[in-house]
Amino acid sequence: HCLKYGLTLHNVLQVRGFTAQGEPISFGAEALDAPGYDLLSLAVGSEGMLAVTLEVLVKLVPKPQLARCIMASFDDVRKAGDAVAAVIAAGIIPAGLEMMDKPMTAAVEDFVHAGYDLSAQAILLCESDGTPEEVEEEIARMSEVLSRHGATAIAVSQSEAERLRFWSGRKNAFPASGRISPDYMCMDSTIPRKRLADILLAIAEMEKKYQLRCANVFHAGDGNLHPLILFDANDPDQLRRCELFGADILETSVAMGGTVTGEHGVGVEKLNSMCVQFSAAENAQMFAVKRAFDPQGLLNPGKVIPTLQRCAEYGKELVRGGKPKHPDLPRF
């Protein structure tokens, strides 16, 4: 529900901990603002690479009095994508705005029997929460926008049990995918909302290119994709094609104005993709920040920043039989 309530960054007021050298740090404050650079945002977004966190002060919000959910069917993914953009353009910020394509809908319906329209090419789940009066007005406005942009069917939850049933398919998308494929790789990228249909059509072409199926489920409201590439990890060639497929999705997302991650982070899986999104100079600047906080490279070494030389710089390069890896590449 970060579309309405914000990301982790927007809900953390203060972080306390220690650097790798044992120096105490404190970023942010209990007050709404703090002087100096916004190091709190830097710490929250660092994936544990800059400091060891011991204490986090978070913002709490009241639990809404009521929540209701719209389930809308579309006979075309472009119409569904356009409807997502239209909801936001109308000044409506739903508590949740999720989308599933036909393969994913079929998988979850067989698993949890949520009552999804199996003839639909895409399904949107749009949730409104707040006071009963606010919810009633917002549900009516969203229904009107969805109808105007091609929804073939619209159902509105009339009870808490029905709302949970609508959501049960979305929340069980990953385990449902495990029923239709031995393995799957979940990707995580973000694109502008207006390109939702474009990326889905591009992924459909990639399915043909790599000869692998893909089921799509994602946080449509903020353009955060979670394509699930279906494959068999016991087949080395399928694994190879799956990894290429995933990298292609990330590169295409960047080309469409998006990013290589939305919420899962970079870690080691997306190191190469960081070179697609950022220039060598930009990656070097991020590495400089890392060195300033952690000069010995003790915290999450080898993560996020794609620079080979750091392994040699820190004396952590693995050498077997006196032969370093990639001897042709420059080192310091």
Segments predicted by a language model, with ranges:
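Conserved, mostly hydrophobic/aromatic
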Residues: G48, P227, D294
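Short, hydrophobic/aliphatic alpha-helical segments
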Residues: P24-A43, K208, E243-G257, F287
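Intrinsic disorder at enzyme termini
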Residues: A281-F332
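Short beta-alpha connecting loops at secondary-structure transitions
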Residues: N234, V268-C275
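Acidic/polar loop patches that form or flank catalytic/metal-binding clefts of enzymes
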Residues: P24-I25, P94-G96, T152-A155, V260-G262, ...
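Short acidic/histidine-rich active-site segments
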Residues: F218, T259-V266, P301-V304
